[in-house]
């Protein structure tokens, strides 16, 4: 019979049972403390000016910097595509960009780019053909910046 459950906070958590047996309590937080804990920031949705393309995503910390990832949706007509352009400022003061397209109205396209250590990131969603952006772009939306 259990007389009480006592959780001790500290480096090791133990559960004391009424019979006097001490059993270590393994929790997700205890095992996660030994591995790398990633931080995540969410952004979006960001839509094109005609609202037929939009993107949403997250920024996750990795051991080699940050990774911008998300999904690009297309709700346009025939022979049109949605594009997302990610622009980030590196810790060396240079701007880098990555562009992804989705021409499928039935499924979102997942995208991901490793940005390394950066100071800020912005995203915009545009409409276009299967080969290039033709216009109807949203403004640059700030999706992440160092220090908030």
PLM features: residue spans?
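Post-signal peptide N-terminal regions of Sec-secreted extracellular proteins
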Residues: 31-148
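N-terminal prepro-regions of secreted/extracellular proteins
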Residues: 1-52
């Amino acid at each position: 019979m259990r007389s009480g459950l006592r959780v001790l906070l500290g480096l090791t958590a133990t559960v004391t049972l009424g019979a006097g047996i001490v059993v270590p309590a393994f929790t997700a937080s205890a095992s996660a403390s030994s591995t790398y804990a990633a931080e995540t920031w969410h952004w979006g949705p960001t839509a094109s000016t005609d609202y037929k393309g939009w993107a949403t995503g997250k920024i996750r910390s990795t051991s080699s910097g940050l990774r911008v990832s998300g999904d690009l949706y297309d709700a346009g007509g025939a022979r049109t595509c949605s594009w997302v352009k990610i622009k980030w400022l590196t810790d060396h003061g240079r701007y880098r960009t990555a562009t992804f397209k989705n021409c499928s109205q039935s499924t979102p396209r997942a995208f991901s780019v490793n940005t390394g250590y950066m100071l800020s990131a912005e995203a915009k969603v545009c409409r276009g053909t299967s080969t290039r952006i033709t216009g109807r772009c949203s403004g640059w939306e700030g999706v992440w910046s160092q220090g908030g």
